[in-house]
Amino acid sequence: MAPRKTVGILGGGQLGRMLTHPAALLGIPLLILDSGSYTPAKQTLLPPPPHSHPDGPFTSETHIRKLASACDILTVEIEHVNADVLEAVEKEGLCEVQPSPKTIRLIQNKYDQKKYLAERGVAVAPFEELPANPTEEDFKAIAGRLGLPLMLKAKTLAYDGRGNSPLKSASSEDIQASLKFLGDRPLYAEGWAPFVKEVAVMVVRNKEGEVQSYDAVETIHRESILRVCLTPLRGEKGVNQRARELAEKAVGHLEGAGIFGVEMFLMPDGELLLNEIAPRPHNSGHHTIEACLTSQFENHLRAILSLPLGSTALRVPSAAMVNILGASSTMDAIDKMADNALTVPGAAVHLYGKAESRKARKMGHITVTAESDAELNERLRALLFAQPDAHADWIDLIAPPSPAPAHSHAKPLVGIIMGSDSDLPVMHPATKILEKFGVPYELTITSAHRTPERMVKYAKTAADRGLRAIIAGAGGAAHLPGMVASETSLPVIGVPVKASVLDGVDSLYSIVQMPRGIPCATVGINNSTNAALLAVRILGTSVPALNKATEEYSKALEEEVLAKVDILEEEGWDKYIERLKK
């Protein structure tokens, strides 16, 4: 293998630190420019001989040029760099820069970025530029056009909510308060986006313009700081795929190679609006280290070095990331959260090696993976309740607790549906089987004839909501299982219900006689027990613990029968029959 090119990184924080891990595995020499000899990134990888990691500001022209002279490629772990110097370095042939300095400069100015994307057909919230030194009349005029409330945003040097200020009214008091918060910076205004979720997608782009996206994540903030990410994004109307397509479209209009973090809003009507892009690894992609086949950090290096891009697919069905934030100047709370995470199955701790803690500073993160959303919920709750600012109501919104008995789970794997409440006694045994195996489920009524739109919506959204199998009970014409099977990619198990006439044979024939290409499994009449067992076996193909549990269940059935054989042989069949009559 030919020697790898040397990569220089502007910035030596936690993102640079996490870039060093795949660099070491791939044999990629790194040089890191930042002030200090023991920054988070410099702690974890030695520089290639005879060099040392340069010590100095990553915005300094002198230091950037010195770094460029020792590297083949420069990249960034933070966008607040000197784009002019990077452009000059590349033009002079000192070093290649990725992503393109042109892209970095564009993204540094959030107004220019938004204007550029909007002109290329990327969906964004309405926005307008404010003049330099805006007056109160300027604010009132723009409020009249965009409506109130609106969001005032700094064009540059804004992150973690530090460049945003909501303007709730056009009063002098509110305007002056926003100006004081934002300081003397160029501003623009953005129409209010009453989103239902904040979403992010990581996109990797190579030098040829090929883009690949990771599964979308739901990003959950408190006080404008990212606290939790959940993936894959659950929702209706194929929202995960639509988010990926929007992110790929946006990054496709940029220049240069690397990883990009694309933030967006999911609106009440299902529309997605792009918020902003980061030209670097992003907090909303940290889960990819454990949860994906190739992490965002490795793919960034692959992209800028023209190596084959790695798969962005998830390794696991469900994953989350929890930021570890400083609670004070001491490390006590951080150590407590990290130690607690070591007791949570599927959790991986990443501490950033920062020497000083302060309130709300990002000191590390925890990734947690699971075989299902429900399992992830339980693990996530254990992590969140260990945080110093744990708030039960907030945690319950993110990771709902297990439901009360005989109530639907918030994160079900199996859906149990029936056409009428009269079918409930037949379908009830299925719930007991699923509970026995610890499989989260939901139960509801939807009729193929009386509520056809509800049935279609249920079927079409089932997979996006995280369901992996559907048990459908129906009597008489019994169209429900087949109609649901025609509207979903999930396995559907039909339960023929014995109606008042024909003893359920009509239901059986209706369900079992599906046309080719629309499979619908069918069990015996009124046998929801077997339907649930089949659902568990289906889940067991991807969840080893359930596969083992079904084996133990079958073994218990065998032992039960063998015990009866022993009693029959010991007592004789006459006494055995008398026993059965009691």
From Swiss-Prot:
It comes from the Eukaryota. SMART domains: AIRC. The keyword ATP-binding applies. This is Phosphoribosylaminoimidazole carboxylase. ATP binds at residues 143-200. Residues 114-305 form the ATP-grasp domain. It comes from Cryptococcus neoformans var. neoformans serotype D (strain B-3501A) (Filobasidiella neoformans). It is an enzyme of class 4 (lyase). Its EC number is 4.1.1.21. It catalyses: 5-amino-1-(5-phospho-D-ribosyl)imidazole-4-carboxylate + H(+) = 5-amino-1-(5-phospho-beta-D-ribosyl)imidazole + CO2.
